Curated annotation (Swiss-Prot):
Species per Swiss-Prot/TrEMBL record: Mus musculus
Pfam family for this entry, one: zf-C2H2
ZnF segments: C2H2-type: 356-380, 386-410, 416-438
Name by which UniProt lists this protein: Transcription factor Sp8
An annotated GO cellular component: nucleus
Domain notes: The 9aaTAD motif is a transactivation domain present in a large number of yeast and animal transcription factors.
Length: 486
């Protein structure tokens, strides 16, 4: 605080030479320290007492020995003399306020030597060191710094309190010695070991700090970058660098040839080889008999690589459903389709017919669509996938039109109306029976109309669709025939 105040007071002076040599330029401005002698002596006494108390408090830290107390008293006396000589209370106005006399400098040097010999912390925390005296100008401040000659020469021109900031941190090792056990992150905290003698050399040589791990640890192309570290560093630093390099270097070595060989034809050829054919088992090739109207496929040749001997044997032993899984057509297991696929190109005539026969022995029914054949096969197997979702019903049906017909019993919908009397019915066969009563003995016509109505019900069984009737029922009967019925 005192050093900062003195620096602020001495800064507005014109020049150091004018302060020490000429009194005319020194007395032009306003200077707060040039007051009455009583106030000047009071301020000097206050500063001296504060410095003496500071010296005593610093001496009390040394353990309370008699030699330390004597050294502290000498330092306090030297400081009082220094302050009294520096501020020159009642002196001639021509003398500089901050010029240090040779006697005060010698006294301060003696006090510093006594304090250095008695205090174990004098090398690091001694306040009163030998000041660096500037010849003629009187502008040099008291030097703090370390106890060695090199440190005192380097820091002689620094203030007392600021000089400790720039000193080496290695001096603190005498106060707080490190534990002998090595820390796992020792090389991160400090690059040098506290026990090595070259610690100060490494720190002064401009080595990287503890947060500078080095630019090489990111460089994955140089996994041996730890060899560039100084030899005086802790051995754990080399291990850390190696551990940092090893994961990235390992990945670099493992995948070094990936960009060159993974996408080349030589490296990917094993995917298409017979040994690696299992990778493409889920994607079956399109069989030549899949499309009935297509020409014979060139893949069916003996020299084709896709249909080699190995895959052909696998396809022959696998079920037809898996072989035709990705053929683009609905799977059909009827005897006609199996025969057409077995014949290959020779079975094109069977495929053009589009006939799907029931394979159950003794049935022999034939359908033109695979969906109709599947619906027929449910009669044989007893499968009923269509369930009524009406409340407390849950009935199951084989065909969707049967389910739609059943739902009309719940809703009460009557889709079919009589064209003569406009009477409505839920089912088309009921309407056909009713129309027979209007036709009067037209058994053949009535039976034909009933069959057509039943087919209409089966084909157009979607709910909400408009009622469909046969053309005969849509035509109004002749008046004479109706009169005869009446």
């Amino acid at each position: 605080m005192l050093a900062a105040t003195c620096n602020k007071i001495g800064s507005p002076s014109p020049s150091p030479s004018s302060l020490s040599d000429s009194s005319s330029s020194f007395g032009k401005g306003f200077h707060p320290w040039k007051r009455s002698s009583s106030s000047s002596s009071g301020s000097c006494n206050v500063v001296g007492s504060s410095l003496s108390s500071f010296g005593v408090s610093g001496a009390s830290r040394n353990g309370g020995s008699s030699s330390a107390a004597a050294a502290a008293a000498a330092a306090a006396a030297a400081a009082a003399a220094l302050v009294s000589d520096s501020f020159s209370c009642g002196g001639s106005p021509g003398s500089s306020a901050f010029s240090l006399t040779s006697s005060s400098a010698a006294a301060a040097a003696a006090a510093a030597a006594a304090a250095a010999s008695s205090s174990p912390f004098a090398n690091d925390y001694s306040v009163f060191q030998a000041p660096g005296v500037s010849g003629g100008s009187g502008g040099g401040g008291g030097g703090g710094g370390g106890g060695s000659g090199a440190h005192s020469q380097d820091s002689s021109h620094q203030p007392v309190f600021i000089s400790k900031v720039h000193t080496s941190v290695d001096g603190l090792q005498g106060i707080y010695p490190r534990v002998g056990m090595a820390h796992p992150y020792e090389s991160w905290f400090k690059p040098s070991h506290p026990g090595l003698g070259a610690a100060a050399d490494v720190g002064s040589a401009g080595a990287s700090s503890w947060w500078d791990v080095g630019a090489g640890w990111i460089d994955v192309q140089n996994p041996n970058g730890a060899a560039a570290l100084p030899g005086s560093l802790h051995p754990a630093a080399g291990g850390l660098q190696t551990s940092l390099h090893s994961p990235l270097g390992g990945y670099n070595s493992d995948y070094s040839g990936l960009s060159h060989s993974a996408f080349s034809s030589g490296a990917s050829s094993h995917l298409l080889s017979p040994a690696g054919q299992h990778l493409m088992d889920g994607f079956k090739p399109v069989l030549p008999g899949s499309y009935p109207d297509s020409a014979p496929s060139p893949l069916a040749g003996a020299g084709s690589s896709m249909l080699s001997a190995g895959p052909a044997a696998q396809l022959g032993g696998s079920p037809r459903s898996s072989a035709r899984r990705y053929s683009g057509r609905a799977t059909c297991d009827c005897p006609n389709c199996q025969e057409a696929e077995r014949l290959g190109p020779a079975g094109a005539s069977l495929r053009r017919k589009g006939l799907h026969s029931c394979h159950i022995p003794g049935c022999g029914k034939v359908y033109g669509k695979t969906s109709h054949l599947k619906a027929h096969l449910r009669w044989h197997t007893g499968e009923r996938p269509f369930v009524c979702n009406w409340l407390f019903c849950g009935k199951r049906f084989t065909r969707s039109d049967e389910l739609q017909r059943h739902l009309r019993t719940h809703t009460g919908e009557k889709r079919f109306a009589c064209p003569v009397c406009n009477k409505r019915f839920m089912r088309s066969d009921h309407l056909s029976k009713h129309v027979k009563t209007h036709s009067g003995g037209g058994g053949s016509a009535g039976s034909g109309g009933g069959k057509k109505g039943s087919d209409t019900d089966s084909e157009h069984s979607a709910a909400g669709s408009p009622p469909c009737h046969s053309p005969e029922l849509l035509q109004p009967p002749e008046p004479g025939h109706r009169n005869g019925l009446e």
